[in-house]
Structure formats: C-alpha cells, structure tokens
Amino acid sequence: ILPEFFTIDELVHKISQKQEIKGIALWLFAYQTYTQLYQDEDLATFLKWFPTLQKDWDDMLKFHGNDKEILEWMLAEERIKNWGENLGDEEGARKRNLNFWRKMNAFLPFLKEKLEEQQLATSGMIHLYTKENLENYCKNFNLRAVFIGFNAFTPVEEKLVRTLLQWDKADIFFHADEYYFHDERQEAGKFLREYKTWKEFNDSRDFNWIENEFSVDKNIKVYEVSGNIAQTKVLPEILSEIHTENSDYQNTAVVLLDENLLPATLDSLASVEKLNITMGFPLKNLAFSNAMKKLFHLHKQLEKNASSYYYNDILPILDELPKNFKDENIIKNFVATLEERNIVYISKKQLSELLNGLSFYNLFEKQDAETLLNTLIDFCKDLKYNEIDNVQYENISHFEKSFVIIKNQLSPYQYQVKIETLEVLINQLINSESIDFVGEPLEGLQLMGLLETRLLNFENIILLSANEGKLPLGNSQNTYLPFDVRKQFNLHTFLENDGIYAYHFYRFLQNAKNIYLLYNALGSGVNTGEKTRFITQIEMESQHKIEHIIIENTSEPINQEPITIEKTPSVLEKLEEWKQKVSPSHLVTYLYNPIDFYLDKILNTRETTEIEEELSQRNYGTLVHNALEYLYGKIIGKILKVNDLENLLQQVDESIDKAIERLKHQPEFYEKGMNFVHKQIAKRVVESVLNYDLELVKKGNALEIVALERKIENIAFKIDDNNEVTFYGFIDRIDILNGTLRIIDYKTAKPKNLKIKIEEAKIETLFFEDKYKQAMQLCMYQYCISQIDEFKNREIETGIWSFAEVNNGVQNVEFVKGNFEDSLVSVKNLILEILNPEVPFTEKVHESWN
C-alpha cells in the first residue's frame, strides 16, 4: 500500500483547519471591508496597491507572526521621516506614505477580524492557525511522517518538522553536496547549514544526505549566444553531441528559465519523437490572449467616450480571433476598404457598416463591464463549436472559465466595476494559468522549468537563459517593506530568494555528467546580457574546467550576385504585349532597376496598399495634382485674365477638400499632427502656382490652359525598320504662353539634369543613365505631342514645375549641345535593349546609406 502524499503546504492547511481565501475572492472581500472604514477609493484604485500589500502582510504573518508590530514600526518610521508634516505640502509623497500606513494600521487588523468571522484565512493567517494547533496535532499524530528534499522552511513549517522529530514520529532526508554545504561562502547551502545545527540531529539521528558528487569530473560547456530565440537553435546540435549512437534522449533534460522560450524550443525539438513537457504553455502568450488584451484596450478607449476606433486597435483583434469562412470574407473586404480609403480612425457608423454581419461584431460595441463579461462568456461558448485545434480549444476554455469565475465572484457585491478593473481581475487569473501537456515522464527528453527539477537527477542537462536576473531573479521583489525592515523582522529578502535559487541550481548540477549552460549575451530591456553569477562562481571557485563557446549572428554583409532573369519565350511574349502600350514611366522604372520593370510589367505585380498614418510623398503629390486640376479645370480654353486667377485663389480651400475626397481619404485624417502640416503645405503650393501664373498675366503675358491630365495614346514610335512601339501616358498640364506650347510635368522632387549636352560618342546611350530620367520623360512627352494633329508644327517647350521649388515656375529641358531629335536615338536604343532576347533583366543594386 502506498503512503499518503502531501506537499508541505497541504499539510499546513490541514493542520490549520481553516478555509483559505485568495486571489480575486480575497481582493473583493478586502475592498468591501476597506469601504467600511474609508470611502476614498474605487475598486480600480484599490487593486493597484492591495495585491502587493497582501503579499507583504502574508510575509509578516508567516515569518514574524506579529503583523501589528511591523505595521506600527512602518508608521513610526514614516512619522519620523515626516516630522515637519505641518510645515509643508499637505499632499507630498511623505504625507501620502504616512497616511497610507496610518490606514493600514487600522485596515489590516479589521480585515483579519472580518475574515475570522467568516472562518476564512489568508495564506499568512493559515500559518498562524497552524502554529496554534501544532502541538495538539503532533501529540495526536499516530502515523510516521517522512519529509523529503526540502531546503527552505517557514518558521511554522520548521516547528512542525522539529516537533515530529522530537517525538520520533518523523524522518527527514535532505539532498545536499559537500561542495556548497561545508563552504560558508556558498549561498546554496545557507538554509541547510542552519538545519544541521538543530538539536534533533544527534548521535542517534544523522543529517542525511550529504553527497560528494559535485567534485566528480564533469563536461561543462557555457554557450554565449547572441539572441534569446537563438539559444533554442543550438539545441539540436547539443543533443546530437550527447546522443551520438541513439536518439531516445533517455536521462536528458532541457530546462527553460524563461517560459516565453517554450514555443521556439518546441520548434527546435520538432524531430524529437518522445518528449515530455512538464512545464505548462503560458496562456498569456497565445494568440487568443493577445486578442483579449487588445479588446480590453479598445473598450477602455470606448469607456472614455472615444468617438472613433483607431484602425490598429481593431485589426489585431480581427486577425487573432478564430473565425468562420463568412467572417474571413467580411474582414478581407473591411481591410481592403481601410487601405483603399486610408482610414486611420474609423467612426462607429463606419465600423457598423463595414463589419455588418461579422459573427462577433458585438465585441466591438460599447458596453459596461458587466455586459461585456456576459458577452465574452457567450462568445467563448460559441467559439468552441467552431473547427479549432486543441490548443485553441484549451485556450478559449480557460478564458471562459476565468470569465465565469469573475462573474460569480462579483455577483455578491454591488460594485460599479470599470473595464480597467475587469481587465485587472482577468489578468490575475490568466497570467497564472497554463495549458498542460500530456506526456510520458519515464522516457524520452524531459522539458521543464527549474523549480520542477527538485528531487530529480539527470545525466545530461541543458539550461537555457542562464542570465543574471533570470538565475537568480535578483533584487526584483515587489514590496512596500524596505530591505532593512524585512531584515529587522526576519522576513525573506532577495538575499534569501537568491539562496533558494542557488540551491536549486547546484543541486541539479551535482549528479550530472554533461552540463550545457546557455545565456543570451545581447542586452535588451531588463536583460543585461550578463551570464549568471553562478557560472562565474563555478569558474572561480570549483576545480571544474569550463569550455566557452561563442555563437553570434554575423553582421558582415553577404556578397550576393545580382539577380538575373533570362528572357524566355513566355517573357518575350509579354514584351510583345508591352510594345502596344509603352509609358515614359516604364522606361524610368527600367533605368532604376530592370528587375522592378520585370516584376511590374511582365509579372504584373503591384505594391501592396498600406494604411498611412502620415501622408506619403506619393499621396502628397496626388493631393496637389488633384487640387490644381480641380481649379484650372474651370478655366480651360480661354486666355486668362487677372480676375480668373484671383477667383481661383478664393477657392483653394475648396480645391484641397475636393482633392482629399478624390483620394478617398477622411477629412479627419488631416485635422492634426503632421498630416495637418502636409495639408497646409499643399495649400500653400497650390496658392503659389496660382500666384505665379497671376504675376505672368499681370505683366501682360498671354496664358491659355489647353489641357489638364491630357491622355496620350496610340502614338507610334519606330525603333527599327520592321518594328515600332506605341506610346501612351498622361501629361499633367499643356498650356500656351505667348504663342509657345508648353508641356508641364508636376513633380514633388527637385528638377535634375535638365541641361543636356549630347556628345557624338554618347548619342546612342544618353538616356541609359538614370540621372537623365526626368529629361527622358519630357522628351518622350514632346515627341507624343508633336505627333498629334492639333499640335503639329508648333513651337514646343517641355519642363518640370517642382512643388519643392514652386516659386521658380517651370524649368525647361535645354539642349546645350545636340537637339531634340538626337535625344530620341537613345530612347529608341533603350527600348531595343528591353526587347532584345539576348539581354537578360539584371538587377541594378543601389547603395543605401543609413
């Protein structure tokens, strides 16, 4: 017959004969008690400080017993610090601290009294009741207790063990090693050295067991790895080194000090057939959990009466929640509309229109905390009927359970709960929850956390995230009690916690033969990139030789050959189609990078549309184009007068609004921040163009707008005796100034290299250089216009009107040497190169400077 097994906590609870209250149930009960004394805080504010105080209170009761003494000490200390309280600011930090401890001296004893009335107890109170019942329990204890593998006891646990030992009703077996047990400098043996001095250990009872295994030769390797996830990528190599002949991985453990590495670790161990995972998969790291976090953030904004939804608050929720086929289509259309119209802030009406029919649309509607809780419970129930994988099912089930628990816990109270409060309560449950895996503990590779290694020995151990701050945790206690107060009253500090971690580490290593310690050498956030001090201790204090291995991501550039794409028959067929519709912009694309031309014109790929939170240069240019087209479109075909342009100047605001409407952007997009600035700059550019033309007219120049956004098509251009291509495109503006026909191309960029010097040697390849792309476009536009009957035999000027230099007016192409006809030779040759089957598309690499 097997003996009855207890954890030490279970035994302490049994002796106390009290029902423990913890977590949310305790918080809500405590708040109700608090409001009987003070009515100055709502539940959300109370929950910001009470959970930390409650842990401190439990520590007072567990390790000192007299919480009143510590509370009075804290009050006295604050009064000393605040000796001049009536001389200064009544609301200063010290004043607030003093008032806090005054309240706690009244509140915590009152809370204890109220809990006792309900026969309830916190973890700390459980220890007090156990202490009271201990002697009677031990006296009537008729079995034999065996305590195995302990390291650090609370005072009550220690008294329980020692009392049973004194009455010869128990045995105790520790697990230690001479290396850290006999060396006073070793924090790992701190508690065990104290226990060795118990009077219960004498000639008739030995202190068992102290081994001498740590000093046995070991193969220890320390890996300095550049990156957190990168540590997991080293695992297959280490495992292949350990198991050269077989792959059952018997007697091998992988220990994760950072639970967030579990998904990446499982990916790296995909080839391992037998794997037992004793640590749970943290619920907070799964997609559904992330969606819930985003959802609560969204509802907090709605609770503050937000008039619209920020698109980036909506999209992650839609992306990460499980959905059916109908939902997928609705979301696809929703995203397409946002991208097409560049909707950054979505009105409630728009959201209703765009997501109408979504099965979980009600999650986005504004509702109070109680209604939202019921909505989430129903949502989780419905989701479980969808086709989802086992991990998702468990994830959703845990959330449903948590929502129901919170609803049941809140129901006895009449609290006005805010969304923020509901979020805190849910996080309390979810952050401590994990999805458990089913495995075979007696075979295969073991994957676990450090605390799960207690009482277990492995021949081969691999420890990941062996960083300072992870092992040990260091001075990261969340407490209201200063270090000196904790030391004064024998409460655990980070020093005791370091000792506990040190014991787990050294005890786990002492029986191993092959030890692999990996740490992340990159400093990021709370990670300093420093290896744990325990590794340094082994290096400096033990006889073991350690092999150090550095694994880093190389930052050296990889020399890659430019991409080359041959012109296959199918590509040549596409080029024949392209010949029927050649735009000047196509040649510009080819000049910049032939591969871009191939992707765009042969494969017909397009850049994906993305939502712009700040107006892009492309859309800024379109905004100005559209506004100018709207204004000048009213005066096409007439010789302009001063009042024509003055009237247009009064309509600039209207033109900008019409341009925004044509872009399908929301007016709200331009109401604040940099987008407001861009709108004002666009307005100023439009005004500057009008004013420039106005000055021309005032000086007696004859100006007529002939066309705007003039479409040119079916313009034949001979490239050799047997072949021709057809040009097409759009010209931003055609006007006549004092009898000269002007072709004007609007640009957001500055004009470059418009003065052309065609040398005899360069006539064939002038426009093969990217720097002449603007001039090439203008020459092609001039050719196209010269082929149209209504413009034949006209004197033509072509130029750029740059929005960046708007006050300079039109800057024309100028032939310093050579002429317009000469320029067309290189246009012809460039097209011939594109069509040449023997010339592949070769990537042109442009240097970038960061």
Model-derived segments and their meaning:
Residues I1-T7, V12-I21, D203-N807, E814-N850:
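Anion-coordinating catalytic cores for phosphoryl-, nucleotidyl-, and glycosidic chemistry
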Residues D40, G84, G92-K95, K112-L115, ...:
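Generic N-terminal initiation segments characterized by hydrophobic and/or small/turn-forming residues
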Residues L43-T45, Q54-R94, L98-W101, E178-Y180, ...:
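Low-complexity, compositionally biased segments
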Residues F50, W167, I788:
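Acidic-histidine catalytic/liganding microenvironments
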Residues D183-D206, K294-H297:
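Ligand-binding grooves and catalytic loops that recognize ribose/phosphate and carbohydrate rings
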